[in-house]
């Protein structure tokens, strides 16, 4: 039986590819998709969800827009990474359907309430919508199987020296998620920076030759340009968000550890840092499964295999 999931995202090139991977995988049943502000403004990320589902011919999936700003802060966006539209590069179709007439939290709550079994929440943007759901619907916590997030790092940040972008945008929300008592799986930069797509991988995807694989290749063409900056030391572009979906499909591709994770909300230099108690230096019990390594070639092979679904 397919695993029911609820996807909360802020497309974003890598979010878009995570959607492609999820909807090409019969092991997963995508119940709804909600959008958050982050990689671009809330209006643009919502539109990008609708554009991707129009491309994939999955306008049957309910969509709702989420919070327009973080819980306690002003919004920061990553337009320098994802371009003016949030999905610069390919020519994507205009949406042929509208979002639901409700908020992201209302759609999430409805989805959980109506599901016969607990739902896995996959959150690949800031954690604002998920935190609002947890705070406003404590009665639904038992309907959440786990929360799989792309965010954080045990080491270096990518937005500040200490913080990864998604967590930095709304650290208070991320702290609510990590301390919720619900199982959390963290795909942080430690693993996503190893999930790099090289130029030859992009050409492999392009050669599959269907409209979706071509769009994915064009998304990666744009994404690779930003990551060519020598400061990163990358060979290709790190495909952050699809690691969450890939872990659900093939956990054997990933090395994980069970650790306690907290989020720094106050530090002068460290706001948004995920503090991982790797060496068990506190009495805090582990609250997260933390990804630390990935079989890069296996990850690329999985993407290539699933892109053939769209032939």
Swiss-Prot record:
Claim: Hydrolase is one of the keywords in the record: yes
Q: Matching Pfam families, A to Z? A: IU_nuc_hydro
Keyword line: Glycosidase, Hydrolase
Q: Which GO terms describe its cellular component?
A: cytosol
Q: Return one GO MF term.
A: purine nucleosidase activity
Q: Which GO terms describe its biological process?
A: nucleobase-containing small molecule interconversion; purine nucleoside catabolic process; pyrimidine nucleobase metabolic process
Q: Which residues form the active site?
A: 240
EC numbers for this chain: 3.2.-.-
At the top level, the lineage of the source is: Bacteria
The cross-references to HAMAP family, in alphabetical order and at most eight, read: Pyrim_hydro_RihA
Q: What role does this protein play?
A: Hydrolyzes cytidine or uridine to ribose and cytosine or uracil, respectively.
Query: Which family would the database say this protein is a member of?
Result: Belongs to the IUNH family. RihA subfamily.
Name recorded for this polypeptide? Pyrimidine-specific ribonucleoside hydrolase RihA
Record organism: Shigella boydii serotype 4 (strain Sb227)
Q: Which gene encodes it?
A: rihA
